[in-house]
Amino acid sequence: MIQRDPNLLLSWRADQHPDAPMHNDQRYMTGFGNEFATEAVAGSLPIGQNSPQRVAHGLYAEQLSGTAFTAPRGQNRRSWLYRIRPAAVHGSFSLVEQSHFHNDFGAGPVPPDQLRWSPLPLPSVPTDFVDGLYTMAGNGGPEAMSGVGVHVYAANASMQDRFFYDADGELLLVPQQGRLRVHTELGVLALEPQQIGVIPRGMRFRVELLDAAARGYVCENFGGLLRLPDLGPIGANGLANPRDFETPHAAFEQREGTFELVAKFQGHLWRADIGHSPLDVVAWHGNYAPYRYDLRRFNTIGSISFDHPDPSIFTVLTSPSDTHGTANMDFAIFPPRWLVAQHTFRPPWFHRNVASEFMGLVHGVYDAKAEGFAPGGASLHNCMSGHGPDAATFDKASQADLTRPDVIADTMAFMFETRAVLRPTQQALSAAHRQADYQQCWSGLRAAFQPPITEDAT
């Protein structure tokens, strides 16, 4: 292990340090978008080909494609699975009535108000991950293969004999409370708050809760697959480094019984009976796979001279659009960091943005909001809606001693930023946990303008 001078760490906690353990009992392969090969039973992977006449151990070969066959090689995503039964083996689907999780973003007027919500209440009756999903906002849809759905979840029960897949988009999971063990077709992801997980479009999985209750956020990405942002003049290293992304080794379930397969397809939920666990992939190879990332390993970039840089420097993952330089969705975080800029208002500045910003708080306190923005809560600042630090934060930062650094510690906020307006759902607008008085956080910002007295004025 690299030895570091402890005096240089100052107030950083051990679990915020890049050497912090990952707190899991699973095995992982490292790297972003790598070509992986893994088998839970030796000899299951064919050598030198994908689809032999007879697969070892009586398995079936099946390709899972995440991009078009003809996508450029550097962007092509697919994996070959060697499984006990093909994915086609299940009963007929029927429509499920589920009022809270959907893609109904409405066609009516979108209020330009700044919006904020307290945390989604935890359920009082047994509720698993799928039943606990609650749609907040979104844009676009699976038909156009662009845009996102923004959801939160609150659950207190594991998915035992129930499995889910989303044919509409890949799922970015951001746990806020409670640890998860996500059993997927290609292996098991252990997730805890301050880690994220990405489940590819179409990947079947079930979510096991490791604590009494769990809550968090989900971004359903209908557009281009998430990738690492270009670093430009930053260079070859920085932000989220590829080696810190982890993909599970092959693991499988060999269970038969009465199970339920739930699918999200074209904005609706469907269910089918299935007589076995669909998580029966014994071996696989390819680059279309689930992965996780520990946000505490993010290499934060900032100013060491003056001014607060644009928040794009905090981008972890980006979903590209058809317009170069403009993302379908950016996932950015606001982690522990030092602020040392001189002659500078150090918190995030007041802003109006052509993009739309959905924010959440995983842990601690967000440095631009002294009150009201709690872990598990959320805010939405849509296109050109003014936002920025509240009055208390502005007053404190305007008088701060800039000869000393501001150490932003013990925090983790994040943002889903989209190029299209995020349309809040009716249930989010009318929710009891919506903070109707959110705008009052800026009411204390008084006019302090005092024009200079000139000789002409006297």
Swiss-Prot record:
Residue positions binding Fe cation: H351, E357, H387
GO biological processes: L-phenylalanine catabolic process; tyrosine catabolic process
Gene3D superfamilies in the cross-refs: Jelly Rolls
Pathway connected to this protein: Amino-acid degradation; L-phenylalanine degradation; acetoacetate and fumarate from L-phenylalanine: step 4/6
Active site (UniProt): H308
Keyword Transport belongs to the record: no
Catalytic reaction annotation: homogentisate + O2 = 4-maleylacetoacetate + H(+)
InterPro entries assigned to the protein according to its UniProt record, in alphabetical order: HgmA_C, HgmA_N, Homogentis_dOase, Homogentis_dOase_bac, RmlC-like_jellyroll, RmlC_Cupin_sf
Cofactor requirement: Fe cation
Pfam families: HgmA_C, HgmA_N
Keywords: Dioxygenase, Iron, Metal-binding, Oxidoreductase, Phenylalanine catabolism, Tyrosine catabolism
GO cellular component terms attached to this protein's record: cytoplasm
Residues reported in the UniProt entry to bind homogentisate: Y366, H387
Documented EC number(s): 1.13.11.5
GO molecular function, one term: homogentisate 1,2-dioxygenase activity
Function of the molecule: Involved in the catabolism of homogentisate (2,5-dihydroxyphenylacetate or 2,5-OH-PhAc), a central intermediate in the degradation of phenylalanine and tyrosine. Catalyzes the oxidative ring cleavage of the aromatic ring of homogentisate to yield maleylacetoacetate.
Quaternary assembly: Hexamer; dimer of trimers.
Family classification: Belongs to the homogentisate dioxygenase family.
Name by which UniProt lists this protein: Homogentisate 1,2-dioxygenase
Organism: Xanthomonas axonopodis pv. citri (strain 306)
